[in-house]
Curated annotation (Swiss-Prot):
GO BP terms in the entry: glycine biosynthetic process, by transamination of glyoxylate; L-serine biosynthetic process; pyridoxine biosynthetic process
A GO MF label: pyridoxal phosphate binding
Lineage of origin: Bacteria, Bacillati, Actinomycetota, Actinomycetes, Mycobacteriales
Main location: cytoplasm
Protein family according to the UniProt entry: Belongs to the class-V pyridoxal-phosphate-dependent aminotransferase family. SerC subfamily.
Location of the protein in the cell: Cytoplasm
Enzyme Commission no: 2.6.1.52
Function: Catalyzes the reversible conversion of 3-phosphohydroxypyruvate to phosphoserine and of 3-hydroxy-2-oxo-4-phosphonooxybutanoate to phosphohydroxythreonine.
Protein name: Putative phosphoserine aminotransferase
UniProt pathway annotation: Amino-acid biosynthesis; L-serine biosynthesis; L-serine from 3-phospho-D-glycerate: step 2/3; Cofactor biosynthesis; pyridoxine 5'-phosphate biosynthesis; pyridoxine 5'-phosphate from D-erythrose 4-phosphate: step 3/5
Coiled-coil ranges (or none): none
Required co-factors: pyridoxal 5'-phosphate
Length: 374
């Protein structure tokens, strides 16, 4: 019998819900219940008809309220997830050249996608080591500036502020794991894009972008230039359909319904301010615990860059983080493993709004209990 099978964490210290993944993340039971009640009649029906279009409209209006969209901004959506949006943006938002801040797996991937696109110039890439981040900056040669609000692989959060002297350059923010859990002024961005499976406790396969009038105008001007783009990645097609409360091709009803329920739940509890306070509460508990123990250290050294939705905690060399995560998993406390490519002796904890801060405290107690017995 393995150590993971032998160690049974006492029930009275375990979290009520043991899901701490950084995406897919915890889905609340009430969301799942809605799939079999209010959303049930929509399954197996046309996405071009009123019932499904009303669901899309409910989601779009909910996001507009949650993020207090400035005048002229629109909620645009399409199938494929944020990964597809990188290519869509390379085709449809970059006129000639872009600048990218690269400080982890996901912030680097948009730059890599742009570098492969034959219609735009080589991107300017400003890099920093994992666990840190470059300062957002402008460059006179670029017409789009991109970075990640929250780098999911490392737990680094970079505030969203339009760089000085950026001129007409669009600001595109990958908010895949930041939207809905971190503070943001959407007016500081032109394309704030994300997916449902992080803060919005849904399934993947969908991208959403909060787009400014300048971004929408860029989409139109690039389309008018005659640049070729696959229809699936066409932002003009996505905009046209989104304004009709639909998607270009068939969406997953469950994904839309789960996310709409989560957005309504956030709004009902106080909106984005409430969600941000909740994730900050969870993060405060995790980082204070990590700083108090002699076997743990927050991976992100600068407290100002530490994410309040994805916490990365290094363990000392003589405590095997993989063994700790394995024992936690055997006890129903799951998805605390680090990002696979980071290669650190580390635990990674998702602290999205669906996660109860008390469960984060319980997780830390479980880690202490396990480490004492290794």
């Amino acid at each position: 019998m393995s150590m993971a099978d032998q160690l049974q964490i006492p029930a009275d210290i375990k979290p009520r819900d043991g899901r701490f993944g950084c995406g897919p993340s915890k889905v609340r039971p009430e969301q799942l219940q809605a799939l079999s009640t209010t959303a049930a009649p929509l399954f197996g029906t046309s996405h071009r008809q009123a019932p499904v279009k009303n669901l899309v409209g409910r989601l779009r209006s909910g996001l507009a309220e949650l993020f207090s969209l400035p005048d002229g901004y629109q909620v645009i959506l399409g199938n494929g997830g944020a990964t597809a949006f990188w290519d869509a943006a390379a085709f449809g938002l970059i006129d000639k050249r872009s600048l990218h801040l690269s400080y982890g797996e996901f912030s680097s991937k948009f730059a890599a996608a742009v570098a492969k696109n034959p219609f735009v110039g080589d991107p300017v890439v400003i890099k920093s080591d994992a666990g840190s981040a470059p300062e957002p900056q402008s460059d006179p040669s670029v017409d789009l500036i991109a970075w990640a609000h929250n780098e999911t692989s490392t737990g680094v959060a970079v505030p969203v502020r339009r760089p000085a002297d950026s001129g007409d350059a669009l600001v595109a923010i990958d908010a895949t794991s930041g939207a809905g859990g971190l503070p943001v002024d959407i007016g500081e961005t032109d394309a704030y894009y994300f997916s449902p499976q992080k803060n919005f406790a849904g399934d993947g396969g969908l991208w959403l972008a909060l787009m400014s009038p300048a971004a929408l105008a860029r989409v139109e001007s690039i389309a008018a230039s005659g640049r070729w783009v696959p229809d699936f990645l066409s932002l003009p097609i996505a905009v046209e359909n989104s304004l009709k409360d639909q998607t270009y091709n068939t969406p997953a009803i469950g994904t839309l319904a789960l996310m709409a329920e989560q957005v309504d739940w956030m709004l009902g509890n106080g909106g984005l301010d409430w969600a941000v306070k909740r994730t900050a509460d969870s993060a405060g508990r995790l980082y204070s615990w990590a700083e108090e123990r002699d076997y743990t250290t927050p991976f992100v050294a600068d407290p100002k860059l530490r994410s309040q939705v994805v916490g990365t905690i290094d363990l000392v060399d003589d405590v095997d983080a993989a063994a700790v995560a394995k024992i936690l998993r055997a006890n129903g406390v799951v998805d605390t493993e680090p990002y696979r490519k980071l290669g650190r002796n580390q635990l990674r904890v998702g602290m999205f709004p669906a996660v109860d801060p008390d469960d984060v405290s319980a997780l830390t107690q479980c880690v202490d209990w396990v480490v004492e017995r290794l």
